[in-house]
Amino acid sequence: MAEDTAETTPGVPERGRRRRKTAAEPAAPACAMSIHAHPDDQEFTVGGTLAKWARSGCRVITVCITSGGAGSNQSTPLDMTREALVPIREEEQRRACQALGISDVVFLGYEDGVLEPFIALRRDLTRIIRRYKPDAVVCGDPKVRFYGKGYMNHPDHRVAADVALDAVFPSAETRLIFPELLAEGLDPHHVKRVFIHGAPRPDAFVDISSTLDAKLAALREHKSQMGQWDPADMITAWAREQGKSRGLAAAEAYRLMVLEGP
């Protein structure tokens, strides 16, 4: 149900203010699947939402398409290898999920940094969706290449989002796409809602005021990526900016797709 709120223009009497409709926060799903390219992608973008849903009783499944083996930065030892980094990043992701209240974590094992929209990847994501049967899927926006003037969206992020959406529709709900999955006992599944973060014109907002601390705690578990940097100031500023249009102190914003049934 929409909430009717008044514009708070200083000096304008309440009866003279323009009124606008503010959509209510989307209800938490019973089961949600978060699909991203790397360990820490989820925590940067949607960690507050997932923590809030988990606290409400939602089962959340985290899917990392890669294990972040290319995630090096200035604090990474020069002798670090992909093979050594992968178990570190997987353990960091598990600890981050614990901070958010998530117990189901799946790593698909694709190579970090060179992700391509292979049919094998779509099949793997379709398999995971059919196995867990989420009511909602959370992913990025595959069309976003730039954020402002200072950040280029990682190509792995775009591929992960693109293939996740293709797995949701048509693959997960269409019986004769990947018929080999039927032999595994994985029948078609219809995902009811898709929450797309990073979209240019979001239309759904989740108040994360109560879970911002959990989001920050989860991010801090990614020690191999954070180094000595504390993300609190940046993440808090992002949450404040996303909530501003809805009068929220902290929010995560989405384009919400409500998908018609097959």
Task: Label the predicted regions.
Residues 2-35, 104, 118-262:
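Metal-dependent de-N-acetylase/amidase catalytic core
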Residues 2-133, 255:
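Active-site rim/loop-helix segments in enzyme catalytic domains that contact anionic ligands
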